[in-house]
From Swiss-Prot:
One of the record's GO molecular function terms: structural constituent of ribosome
Signal peptide: none
UniProt keyword DNA-binding present: no
Pfam families: Ribosomal_S21 (PF01165)
Descriptive protein name: Small ribosomal subunit protein bS21
Gene that encodes it: rpsU
Biased composition (Basic residues): 45-61
UniProt source species: Dechloromonas aromatica (strain RCB)
Family from the record: Belongs to the bacterial ribosomal protein bS21 family.
Region (Disordered): 43-70
Amino acid sequence: MPNIRVKENEPFEVAIRRFKRTVEKTGLLTELRAREFYEKPTTERKRKAAAAVKRQHKRLRSLTLPPKLY
């Protein structure tokens, strides 16, 4: 569990923002959502493979040159 020390004379909103940032960096919420329900190993593999294909297509789209517009 990430924890922060609230500095002296630090506004509450700033401390909350720092806490949210540390939680985001640790990936706690994404792991919590992933573990909320049981996912069979086969569906997990399929989901990860589909995400890898999607990432690869996205990377290829960014590498290709746009068509000439003349």
